[in-house]
Amino acid sequence: DSAGRPLALSAPGRLLRHLAGLIGQKLTTDALLTLLKHPLTFSGGDRGDHLRLTRDLELTLRRKGPVFPVGADLIHWAAARKDASALTWAQTLAQTLDTALHATPRRLADHVALHRHLAEALARGTAPEGSGGLWEKEAGEAARVLMETLAAEADAGGELTRADYRDLFESLVNRGEVRDPIARHPGVLILGPREAREQGASLVILGGLNDGTWPRLPEPDPWLNRKMRKDAGLL
C-alpha cells in the first residue's frame, strides 16, 4: 500500500504517545494498565511473566486501589507476594514510573532525552540491556528516526512546558508514516491518486466510488425496476 500506515497508530507510536502525556502527571490506574498491557512493554524480558503479574496487579488495583498508584505501591504489593521475580519486576517498573512522575524537564533537548529514556526502559523491562522491540521493524525504525531528528533539532526549540512538548510530539508523530517495503504480490498494488497517475498498466479495472458518484446510479422509476429496465435495454 503506497499510502503506508500512520506512525501514531503503530505500536511504537502509541507507546511514545502514552508516555508523552504522562511525564510529570499523576498516574491513574487506567493509565498504568494501558502502559503495562502495551505489546512493547517489557518486551525485552520475560513477556509471559510480565503479563501474569500485570493481570494479578490489575485485580488488586481494581478491588483495593489506590486510584493513583506510585512506585512504592507496586513494590509493597510485590513484597507481600513473597515472589522474587515479582519484586524485581515491581522495582524495575517503579523506577521508570517515579522518574516520569518527578521529572521537570525545561529545554526541548531534555524533554526528548527523558522521553526516549522512559520508552526504552519500559520496553527493556528486566532485561540487562537493550530496548526490547521498541525500535524493531519498519514502525520501530520510523519512530527511532523521528526521535533522533527531534533530538538533532532540539537546540533550536528553547524551553517548553510539559504540555507544550506533548502537543509538539503529537503533531510530529501524526505526520509520520510507516511504509512496508515488502511487496505482497507482484501483480497487485494499492496506489494512492498521485502514485496511480505515475504508473502504467496493460489492464485497468475500474471500480465504483464509495460515494456513488461514479458510475452514476439510475434514477428511481415508478414503473420499471432496475432489472426490468436492464432486460429491456434501457440501462
Region roles according to the model:
Residues 1-235:
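Polyanion-engaging groove/track-forming segments
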